[in-house]
């Protein structure tokens, strides 16, 4: 999901949200869209203490889904998309800052049961997955836009991308998140219920 978002954001800012190399759309998209993470450093702990990490993360993914839906209302409207990105990022605060803590708890539990630490193995697996997914997402994205008729800009001409290319870019940047966030929230809730039964 994040890999598809990263692969398509440059194209989304250039061909859907703004105009080619306008110099500000991508900066606004990242700077304003990710700004709540700065405040999130302070807010995350009280929220997670009040709700619990699992509930805070599940609720955050639901809020992130709402933010993505705001973006999908009008994917070419800069103000609306920025508002949606802010809501999405606020929703992602618990997962952004708590996922490492939860991984640490899981590693401690593995050590308690097996008497062995597996930090190195888990780090290696995570790095492999991140690297592979980045490459796979870029391949899927480039294949998709090339098959749908993407026209690269030249020194003399800045083309207008057809609707199919624009819709594919929107799907990669926003649509994939809209599909994933509710599923992740449900998985988080299911994991919490399973954890309660095991205790």
Label the model's feature ranges.
Residues 1-199:
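Membrane-embedded alpha-helical bundles of multi-pass transporters/translocases
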């Amino acid at each position: 999901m994040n890999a598809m978002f990263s692969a398509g954001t440059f194209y989304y800012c250039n061909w859907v949200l703004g105009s080619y190399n306008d110099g500000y759309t991508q900066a606004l998209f990242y700077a304003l869209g990710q700004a709540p993470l700065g405040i999130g450093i302070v807010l995350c702990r009280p929220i997670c203490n009040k709700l619990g990490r699992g509930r805070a993360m599940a609720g955050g993914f639901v809020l992130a889904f709402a933010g993505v839906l705001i973006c999908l209302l009008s994917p070419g409207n800069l103000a609306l998309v920025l508002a949606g990105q802010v809501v999405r990022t606020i929703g992602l605060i618990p997962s952004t800052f708590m996922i490492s803590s939860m991984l640490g708890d899981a590693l401690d539990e593995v050590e308690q049961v097996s008497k062995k630490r597996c930090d190195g193995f888990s780090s290696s697996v995570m790095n492999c997955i991140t690297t592979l997914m980045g490459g796979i997402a870029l391949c899927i994205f480039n294949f998709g836009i090339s098959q749908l008729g993407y026209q690269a800009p030249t020194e003399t001409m800045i083309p207008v991308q057809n609707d199919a290319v624009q819709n594919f870019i929107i799907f990669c940047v926003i649509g994939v998140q809209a599909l994933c966030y509710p599923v992740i929230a449900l998985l988080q809730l299911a994991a919490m219920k399973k954890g309660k039964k095991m205790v």
